[in-house]
C-alpha cells in the first residue's frame, strides 16, 4: 500500500491540469481531458481550466478546451467569466475565440462588455 489515497492522486492530477491550462501547454492538457478529466473542472476559487487559459492569454488552449466541450460562460466564485478575464487582460485573440464559440458578453459581474467599457477596449 502506497499511503496515497485516490483523492490525493486526483488532487495532484487536477493541480497539474490547472498548471497546464495556466501555462498554455495544450497538448499535455488535452491528454488529461481525453483520458477522462472533466473539461469543466474547477479549482478552489471556482476557476475552470478554460478560465485559467483565457486569463493567461492562451488562445490555442482556449480553442482546444472549447472543442472538448468546455462551458464558455462558466463563471468563477467571484462571478467572473472567461470572456471578461480575456477582455480585462486585453487578449483579443482569446476573446475572439470565446465570442466565436458563443460566449455571452453580458454574463458575469462585471461583464465582458462592462470590462471593455472600463478599460476602453473598443474591440469588443
Segment roles from a protein language model:
Residues 1-35, 44:
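Intrinsically disordered, low-complexity regulatory segments in ankyrin-centric signaling systems
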Residues 28, 60-61, 93-94, 122-124:
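Conserved ankyrin/ankyrin-like repeat signature
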Amino acid at each position: 500500500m502506497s499511503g496515497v489515497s485516490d483523492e490525493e492522486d486526483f488532487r495532484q492530477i487536477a493541480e497539474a491540469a490547472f498548471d497546464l491550462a495556466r501555462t498554455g501547454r495544450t497538448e499535455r492538457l488535452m491528454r488529461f481531458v481525453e483520458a477522462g478529466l472533466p473539461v469543466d473542472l474547477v479549482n478552489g476559487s471556482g476557476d475552470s481550466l478554460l478560465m485559467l487559459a483565457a486569463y493567461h492569454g492562451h488562445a490555442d488552449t482556449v480553442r482546444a478546451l472549447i472543442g472538448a466541450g468546455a462551458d464558455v460562460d462558466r463563471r468563477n466564485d467571484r462571478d467572473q467569466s472567461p470572456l471578461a478575464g480575456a477582455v480585462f487582460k486585453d487578449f483579443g485573440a482569446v476573446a475572439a475565440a470565446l465570442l466565436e464559440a458563443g460566449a455571452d458578453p453580458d454574463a458575469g459581474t462585471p461583464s465582458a462588455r462592462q470590462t471593455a467599457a472600463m478599460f476602453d477596449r473598443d474591440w469588443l
